[in-house]
Design a protein with these regions (language model features):
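Acidic, surface-exposed loops and disordered segments
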Residues: 1-174
């Protein structure tokens, strides 16, 4: 496991300070944990990977805490990937609670990528399979639905269906 240059780690920490939450009133914090210091956090869960660093997002109880956590962490993951780092969300990972009523919500492992990822085309459903009344006439609606169509989903199931109607897009889960 290769350590990240301290200058680059400082850039990552600076970027964390600039993250734009979806719900600013939903208090959260992100800790960067080095692998040798994981005893402090004691990660447990079904899908753990070994990495030189982990990001632990903890949040206070709030109705939008989970949405906010996902929104903020995805910004950070996209930043790390754009800088050549490999990332992995640790599904069902658990960490010790922080002080001050912050509960761990998301853990992401990251580090220098061992090799450049070779992207193969993702198998995605056709637009006509996701929209109940094709064709989508409104150009803005088409762009929004296309973005959702190519977005990742768990096991690439794409469980969403769309119904554009009266300038709105109704979204249903299958």
């Amino acid at each position: 496991m290769t350590a990240i240059d301290p200058h680059i780690m400082k850039q990552i920490n600076c970027f964390i300070q600039t993250l734009a939450p979806l719900h600013p009133q939903a208090a959260y914090r992100i800790a960067v944990v080095e692998a040798y210091n994981t005893q402090k956090h004691v990660f447990k869960g079904m899908f753990l990977v070994q990495a030189p660093y982990y990001l632990v997002l903890s949040a206070k109880d709030h109705p939008f805490a989970a949405v906010n956590a996902g929104y903020v962490m995805e910004q950070l993951v996209l930043y790390l990937v754009s800088k050549g780092f490999a990332t992995c969300y640790l599904g069902d990972a658990k960490s010790k609670p922080d002080l001050d009523q912050y509960q761990p919500m998301i853990v992401v492992a990251f580090g220098k990528a061992a090799a450049t990822a070779v992207k193969k085309p993702a198998s995605r459903k056709k637009l006509t399979e996701l929209v109940n009344q094709p064709p989508v006439a409104q150009q803005n609606a088409r762009k929004i639905i296309e973005a959702a169509r190519i977005a990742p989903s768990a096991f690439n199931l794409q469980p969403w269906r769309f119904m554009p109607q009266d300038g709105k897009i109704h979204i249903f889960m299958t």
